[in-house]
């Protein structure tokens, strides 16, 4: 006896076949309801907005008061920031300072540009407030105090930081392939680290994803920096992470010691970022007299040139950089001086 299907049942069968539902369809089998993915309502998003506004723990501050204030307290998950500047102007210095200030966040720092020893030594120098060369020389001599401090910092305040250089990245990819994972390129490896590995190691996904720097994402299918930045941004957002991408501005003839604008990221995916910072070293401005350049030797310039938060406030600020590589926030220095003055009264 032939079982007749209603129009709705027939349409359901067709839909199941289209989505590749497993198993043969029997005429006698009742039509199964088709699963339809849900989408958030405006009320759902509004509830998250309210929670976001009242929760100060869900923001990743950079440690520069005026910029963090313009960002509403810092960067949030699913947001992407590009840090742009010419070669050797301090792009990584800014991020190192931010990481050193945020020990409670899981940070996956992928650095095909610099070896992990170099990155960690600079972070430790800031944490220990010592010149990187002094830290290295003391460790070389076997100074027990510095060795103890290095190990203590690394297993406590830096326990949530993972630094993955090119060698570690390649070894991880090979291990994935041996385990049967399909690895088509570096994005697949980074995706596994941000999700599967982080959840296994920490019980949750990474809070912050740093890639240093964009042009060293070696994937033949990503032919230029905008394509690379787009892929990295998509990856970070997919894992609900704060995404920070370092981008080296053109090696053109522009003044290395002058403030850079958003055009410094031209053709570098600046239109893809929610926020963009540019950095420079004022003492490299060749138009300044020699004595002025000498005075600016330890000055670090930073500007928030793209800001999609609130009213889009832009910020430009000069900061002092210490021998340890620490950036001194003028706002914090003013507060400290004010408190000292109050104590003297």
Model regions: which residues?
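A short beta-strand-to-loop transition that corresponds to the Sensor-1 phosphate-sensing loop
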Residues: 113-114, 212, 241, 245-250, ...
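Short, well-ordered beta-strand core segments
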Residues: 107, 243, 276-278
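Conserved, well-folded catalytic cores of nucleic-acid-processing
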Residues: 126-130, 213, 217, 235-238, ...
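Short, solvent-exposed loop/turn segments at secondary-structure boundaries
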Residues: 220-224, 256-257
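The Walker A/P-loop phosphate-binding site
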Residues: 23-130
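Conserved Walker B catalytic segment
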Residues: 222-234
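C-terminal regions of RecA-like/P-loop NTPase motor modules
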Residues: 3-47, 152-159, 170-209, 234, ...
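Conserved inter-motif catalytic segment of the P-loop NTP-binding fold
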Residues: 13, 105-220
């Amino acid at each position: 006896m032939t079982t007749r299907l209603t129009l709705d049942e027939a349409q359901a069968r067709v839909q199941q076949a289209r989505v590749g539902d497993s198993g043969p369809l029997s005429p006698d089998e009742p039509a199964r309801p088709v699963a339809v993915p849900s989408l958030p309502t405006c009320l759902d998003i509004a509830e998250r907005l309210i929670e976001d506004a009242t929760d100060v723990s869900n923001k990743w501050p950079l440690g520069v008061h005026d910029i963090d204030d313009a960002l509403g307290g810092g960067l949030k998950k699913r947001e992407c920031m590009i840090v742009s500047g010419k070669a050797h102007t301090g792009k990584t210095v800014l991020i190192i300072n931010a990481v050193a200030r945020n020990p409670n966040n899981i940070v996956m720092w992928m650095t095909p540009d610099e070896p992990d020893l170099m990155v960690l030594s600079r972070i430790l120098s800031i944490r220990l407030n010592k010149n990187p060369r002094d830290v290295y020389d003391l460790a070389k001599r076997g100074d027990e105090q510095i060795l103890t401090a290095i190990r203590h910092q690394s297993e406590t305040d830096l326990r949530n930081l993972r630094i993955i250089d090119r060698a570690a990245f390649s070894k991880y990819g090979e291990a994935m392939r041996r385990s049967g994972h399909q690895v088509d390129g570096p994005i697949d490896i980074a995706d596994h680290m941000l999700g599967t590995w982080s959840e296994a190691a920490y019980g949750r996904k990474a809070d912050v994803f740093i890639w240093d720097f964009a042009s060293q994402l070696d994937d033949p299918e990503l032919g230029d920096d905008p394509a690379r930045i787009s892929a990295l941004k998509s990856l970070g957002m997919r894992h609900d992470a704060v995404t920070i991408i370092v981008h080296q501005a053109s090696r053109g003839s522009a003044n290395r010691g002058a403030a850079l604008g958003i055009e410094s990221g031209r053709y570098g995916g600046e239109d893809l970022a929610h926020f963009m910072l540019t950095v420079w070293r004022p003492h490299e401005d060749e138009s300044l007299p020699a004595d002025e350049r000498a005075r600016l030797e330890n000055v670090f310039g930073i500007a928030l040139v793209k800001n999609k938060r609130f009213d889009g406030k832009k910020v430009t600020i000069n900061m002092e950089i210490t021998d340890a590589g620490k950036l001194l926030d003028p706002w914090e220095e003013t507060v400290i001086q004010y408190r000292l003055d109050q104590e003297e009264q």
